């Protein structure tokens, strides 16, 4: 292991300790954050920022979310839908999908920006991660592969995309930030036999969800 690899490993461990202090308690989630090399999802000139607890721009008006945000969303999903097939809306850098893959999910991910989708797909291949990628309008989901045990939306929606709700399996969970531009409430919907149960959590700030059932 060279000096840079040792430094990145040290910073990744520091990041996980900070997540623990911030209230992330699920050991499966913490182990996934320790195993996935977050710096691989940054361009080389930006890797020094990979383990800081902040969002970072990745081009095309998109960002890689701060570690705490990723950990919070992941914990909400794992608690309710601990295994199975999951769909991510908004591939971005690919980091969130990689965390889900490390947790043992079968992962499908959709990205609106073709260039980001292609970049993430190449990185997944290089890392040996079997993650299914496509580009397109994520608000419409992936009907050919539905139903999903979990769906995670990594952009701020004005309301819950109805199409995604109906691509959930029974007892499946949808994690989505809902609200105005710049500030949303993390929201979880769980599909029951005759209804959808809804839970609302803390405030977060995401880039807008663009699509037919998003911000247009």
UniProtKB/Swiss-Prot annotation:
It catalyses: [protein]-L-isoaspartate + S-adenosyl-L-methionine = [protein]-L-isoaspartate alpha-methyl ester + S-adenosyl-L-homocysteine. It is found in: Cytoplasm. Its EC number is 2.1.1.77. InterPro entries: PCMT, SAM-dependent_MTases_sf. GO terms for molecular function: protein-L-isoaspartate (D-aspartate) O-methyltransferase activity. GO terms for biological process: methylation; protein modification process; protein repair. Gene3D superfamilies: Vaccinia Virus protein VP39. Keywords: Cytoplasm, Methyltransferase, S-adenosyl-L-methionine, Transferase. GO terms for cellular component: cytoplasm. It is an enzyme of class 2 (transferase). Its main location: cytoplasm. The active site is at residue 65. Catalyzes the methyl esterification of L-isoaspartyl residues in peptides and proteins that result from spontaneous decomposition of normal L-aspartyl and L-asparaginyl residues. It plays a role in the repair and/or degradation of damaged proteins. PANTHER family: PROTEIN-L-ISOASPARTATE O-METHYLTRANSFERASE, PROTEIN-L-ISOASPARTATE(D-ASPARTATE) O-METHYLTRANSFERASE. Belongs to the methyltransferase superfamily. L-isoaspartyl/D-aspartyl protein methyltransferase family. This is Protein-L-isoaspartate O-methyltransferase. It comes from Chlorobium phaeobacteroides (strain DSM 266 / SMG 266 / 2430). The gene is pcm.
């Amino acid at each position: 292991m060279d000096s840079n690899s040792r430094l990145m490993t040290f910073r990744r461990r520091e990041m996980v300790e900070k997540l623990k202090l911030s209230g992330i308690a699920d050991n499966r989630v913490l182990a996934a954050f320790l195993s996935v090399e977050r710096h691989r999802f940054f361009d080389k000139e930006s890797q020094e920022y990979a383990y800081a607890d902040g969002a970072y721009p990745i081009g095309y008006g998109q960002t890689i979310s701060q570690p705490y945000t990723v950990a919070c969303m992941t914990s909400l999903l794992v608690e309710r839908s601990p295994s199975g097939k999951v769909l991510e809306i908004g591939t971005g850098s690919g980091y969130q999908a990689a965390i889900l893959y490390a947790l043992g999910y079968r992962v499908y991910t959709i990205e609106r920006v073709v260039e980001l989708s292609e970049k993430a797909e190449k990185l997944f291949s290089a890392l040996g991660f079997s993650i299914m990628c496509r580009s397109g309008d994520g608000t419409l989901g992936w009907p050919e592969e539905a139903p999903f045990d979990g769906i995670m939306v990594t952009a701020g929606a004005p309301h819950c995309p109805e199409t995604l709700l109906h691509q959930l399996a029974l007892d499946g969970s949808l994690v989505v930030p809902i609200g105005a531009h710049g500030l949303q409430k993390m929201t979880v919907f769980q599909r029951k036999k005759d209804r959808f149960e809804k839970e609302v959590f803390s405030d977060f700030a995401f880039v807008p969800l663009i699509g037919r059932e998003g911000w247009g």
